[in-house]
Amino acid sequence: MEASKESPSAFKTPCKPAKVKSPVNACGTPVTIPASPFMKKLGCGTGVNVYLMNRMGKQTHSPWAIKKINSKCAQGQVSVYQKRLCEEAKILKDLKHPNIVGFRAFTTAKDGSKCLAMEFGGEQSLNDLIEKRREEGLQAFPVDTIEKVALHVARGLLYLHNEKKLLHGDMKSCNVVIKGDFESIKICDVGVSLPLDENMQVSDPKAHYIGTEPWKPKEALEDGVITDKADIFAYGLTLWEMMTLSVPHLEMLDTEGDEDDDDESFEEDFDEDAYYERLGSRPALDAVTLGGSYQRMVELFCLCTEEDPQKRPSAAHIVQVLESNSQLSKQNTEVIVID
């Protein structure tokens, strides 16, 4: 009796049930985000908190910064911030520059909240360092430090504007993270970035410039045409922050009295009308007290905060000038030996 012939397909290995994959990072490694109480809080923003996540394993891993929606956020605003976080993850995933915080993963934590995992850019924001310096009774940052921040942030903006055709949209000291003694300087929080067209304009009628009020240029306050120069205006005010240790257009009040009275005193002395009148303009700067060594930074601040956007320099121009100055400074400090 002839044995029956079976087709090869009859002996296929039974299919195993598909496994549910864990979220992975940019390198393909599964990611598990701890609940918020198990991570150190680094800071907070509008509707979000940022935590430090120390990664455990057989090998040494760099820590990550984890951004997630604040649990105390108003229920009606949660969807808005979730959408913004998703948008930031999408944008950040496409960016790679030494002066911009890098993307690591977009996943869900054990508590069910959406999380954006990012490169740990530093222990503190530039704003944290400004506040600390002011509380210690110190004056402006050393000019070398300001020039270094100016160059590194300008390089990040150049990459965003020219290579990625993106407006950051919320440039300020809070969105610059610092590692160590200014060893690393990176721009963060690209969640409100806007696309730029070939003319460096935000031409999408649906796009809305958000920014932060004290750093907004006149054109943003008056519903004008938004270009890359909106970032440059806010960049200039960020340098001003480092020279004055203040928030643009908000006078720092004398806080020698009881701490309990500070908030009440501020409310009584704050001139709201004057504040709104000053928005979008160049805040005063005492260049004489700063001294001659700050002249380059004072001039850059003035150029960046011109009311007319067309008179402000581009990020490319700023980088070119600052890099030239940096090279010149190095040459001037070299010892020349003549035989």
Curated annotation (Swiss-Prot):
Q: Does Transmembrane show up as a keyword for this record? A: no
Q: Which reaction does this chain catalyze?
A: L-seryl-[protein] + ATP = O-phospho-L-seryl-[protein] + ADP + H(+); L-threonyl-[protein] + ATP = O-phospho-L-threonyl-[protein] + ADP + H(+); L-tyrosyl-[protein] + ATP = O-phospho-L-tyrosyl-[protein] + ADP + H(+)
Modifications made to the protein after synthesis: Phosphorylated; in a cell-cycle dependent manner at mitosis.
Instruction: Name the Gene Ontology molecular function terms of this record.
Output: ATP binding; MAP kinase kinase activity; protein serine kinase activity; protein serine/threonine kinase activity; protein tyrosine kinase activity
**Cysteines engaged in disulfide bonds, as pairs:** none
Keyword hit for Cell membrane: no
- Tell me the Pfam families matching this sequence: Pkinase
- Any GO BP annotation: stress-activated MAPK cascade
The UniProt record gives the binding positions of ATP as L42, G43, C44, G45, T46, G47, V48, N49, V50, K67
State the activity regulation: Activated by phosphorylation.
- Phosphoserine modified-residue sites: S203
Give the first-level EC class, as a single word: transferase
Q: Which domain of life is it from?
A: Eukaryota
Protein name (database record):
Lymphokine-activated killer T-cell-originated protein kinase homolog
Ranked from the top, the taxonomy reads:
Eukaryota, Metazoa, Chordata, Craniata, Vertebrata
